Amino acid sequence: MKKRLLLPLFAALCLSQIAHADEGMWLMQQLGRKYAQMKERGLKMKEYDLYNPNGTSLKDAVVLFDGGCTGEVVSDRGLVLTNHHCGYDMIQAHSTLEHNYLENGFWAMREADELPNKDISVVFIDKIEDVTDYVKKELKAIKDPNSMDYLSPKYLQKLADKKAGKNFSAKNPGLSVEIKAFYGGNLYLMFTKKTYTDVRLVGAPPSSIGKFGADTDNWIWPRHTGDFSIFRIYADKNGNPAPYSEDNVPLKPKRFFNISLGGVQENDYAMIMGFPGTTHRYFTASEVDEWKSIDNDIRIRMRDIRQGVMLREMLADPQIKIMYSAKYAASQNAYKRAIGANWAIKTRGLRQNKQAMQDRLIAWGAKQGTPRYEEAVHEIDATVAKRADLRRRYWMIEEGIIRGIEFARSPIPTEDETKALQGNDASARKEAIDKIRTRYSKFANKDYSAEVDKKVAVAMLTEYLKEIPYENLPLHLRLVKDRFAGDVQAYVDDIFARSVFGSEAQFDAFAAVPSVEKLAEDPMVLFASSVFDEYRKLYNELRPYDDPILRAQRTYIAGLLEMDGDQDQFPDANLTLRFTYGQVKGYSPRDNVYYGHQTTLDGVMEKEDPDNWEFVVDPKLKAVYERKDFGRYADRSGRMPVAFCATTHTTGGNSGSPVMNANGELIGLNFDRNWEGVGGDIQYLADYQRSIIVDIRYVLLVIDKVGGCQRLLDEMNIVP
């Protein structure tokens, strides 16, 4: 092969052909070179109606929801659809035993009944600009050859602010700018974003619909979950972002989705826009090994222990179930994902494929007289090996204690608070106590049970102590051996008995007569301090290994782009707006088994189990089924569709993403992937990978027949 210069990135990619027909989480700027193929697959829209850098398009109806999901605007009054699991925390926050919206659902029959939410946002992408030349020019001014500024969010934000101009945000209310790196720092894009924070809960089905199948069915196809919730964006009277106010009005958006009742058939065109979070497409073989045997294995083991304790307590007490349902669900999602990824690595040859890819690059580089690609691979391999023990200890403390034990987040008094408590200024002492109380209440809130936390802690610490040698333990944890003869239960009981944070009553007693000395000797504070000291120590010891890997990855990815300039390459997901397209299609997971593309309400009833909370069927939904009262939402055969699957390429962050037909009309909401395709974060698996999508007709049926909320249907533009 003749030696070639690396073409400008977008130009090089424009020459490529797709490796797998439906693979790719494509940048919006890459639409032009994918458009012809999309048309061949069935797309009937104009290119500029999907993405128009100089005007409005369907892109303007897609939002980043609450920092980690996707949503879509479906009315001219700012109505937003997303997944039930994306809105779960907000639904839970409004739930009580008296008004249990998690169990019974919530439907605002008037706009005045819509519920405000704390600390929530939706973000529109106003503009996307290629700033690669600008960033690289600025980077040339950096003299340090080992500088990592080319990937530094802080540095890139400085460049974004500089490029946007002085007082940009002041002149443009609600707007902000951000530069993100792609392909390991070989491409840079600047995003202009508009963020709204007055976002109100409008509707949510009962969890028996929105979470039907729960953890048993998570990552599984066939699926029967009505995973949706409804919110509304509010703005000031000029349409600008504003904090919550009764004077705010529903947002009039630039664009919103029409909703199709046409349904789907096998091989129909399907397309998704959204904000995929993280993928590892450019991992080397050693990085795949590390991800599996350290990161995923530890996450699986420690979360399995924690979730086992939580589930037992939730099933034994309805109040605990309300309090811990969101925590359990959040933990389960990453847990199941790790299991699925490891399964794919083991059974689908992903590690071997990455080995073949890097071997091919090394051989190609040698022919070009370019040893730097081989050097990059060797640098990655060596660094992964060097950091293995530190990384294992880091993941154990993160999954086993930081994420696993709630009281590990006990408030550690600041220097200013300590001084205030030592002084004679009563108001300063009160302010210090109030600040400590606020931090205490962040974990010991209405959704906290000290008894559950104790049981989780005993289980987690027992496992942690088996894995970590005594000399590497956080200092306070060494007391398990030194003072309690290895009795973890006695250690945890002692912490709660003697800590001012052991209960609200204990904290109130302390607050009445605050003592710096008591805080300094508090076992929960000492536990938290020693845990975070060790966590920071491990983090700081691992940091020096990051830079050589990131620099080597930049070279490695540049080599792949140069070598395969005649093939498509898309950047790893990083929570930026992307599109993917494919077909509605079933699949065969193994010999003599085929899963069709569509599930129906018949399957919900087949799975019904009144004695298993995961498969309880809502009585209103059951009545609709028994009457066959499906109306205009039924399919051509008269059955009620629930979900379908498609070959689109998605990952975490795509939850809630709009799924469109060939006309750009909304046909469903993406909410999951199948087990067999979860390894798509590393490598797309064409025969197995499927996005799992709740059918929009099921969403509408539930709003109509279960929620009885006709006003929402009247607000949407529903087409045949």
Swiss-Prot record:
Q: What happens when the gene is disrupted?
A: Cell growth is retarded. Complete loss of hydrolysis for ac-DNLD- and LE-MCA. The efficiency of peptide utilization of proteinaceous nutrients is reduced in mutant cells.
Q: Mind telling me which residues the site (Is essential for the Asp/Glu P1 specificity of DPP11) is annotated on?
A: 673
Main localisation? other
User: Which residues participate directly in catalysis?
Assistant: 85, 227, 655
Question: A GO molecular-function term, please?
Answer: dipeptidyl-peptidase activity
Q: Which UniProt key words apply to this protein? A: Aminopeptidase, Disulfide bond, Hydrolase, Protease, Serine protease, Signal
Q: Which pairs of Cys residues are joined through disulfide bonds in the record?
A: 69-86
Q: How does activity depend on pH?
A: Optimum pH is 7.0.
Function noted in UniProt: Catalyzes the removal of dipeptides from the N-terminus of oligopeptides. Shows a strict specificity for acidic residues (Asp or Glu) in the P1 position, and has a hydrophobic residue preference at the P2 position. Preferentially cleaves the synthetic substrate Leu-Asp-methylcoumaryl-7-amide (Leu-Asp-MCA) as compared to Leu-Glu-MCA. Is involved in amino acid metabolism and bacterial growth of asaccharolytic P.gingivalis, that utilizes amino acids from extracellular proteinaceous nutrients as energy and carbon sources.
Q: Which family does it belong to?
A: Belongs to the peptidase S46 family.
* Quaternary state and interactors: Homodimer.
Q: Kindly provide the name given to this protein in its UniProt entry.
A: Asp/Glu-specific dipeptidyl-peptidase
Q: Which organism is it from?
A: Porphyromonas gingivalis (strain ATCC 33277 / DSM 20709 / CIP 103683 / JCM 12257 / NCTC 11834 / 2561)
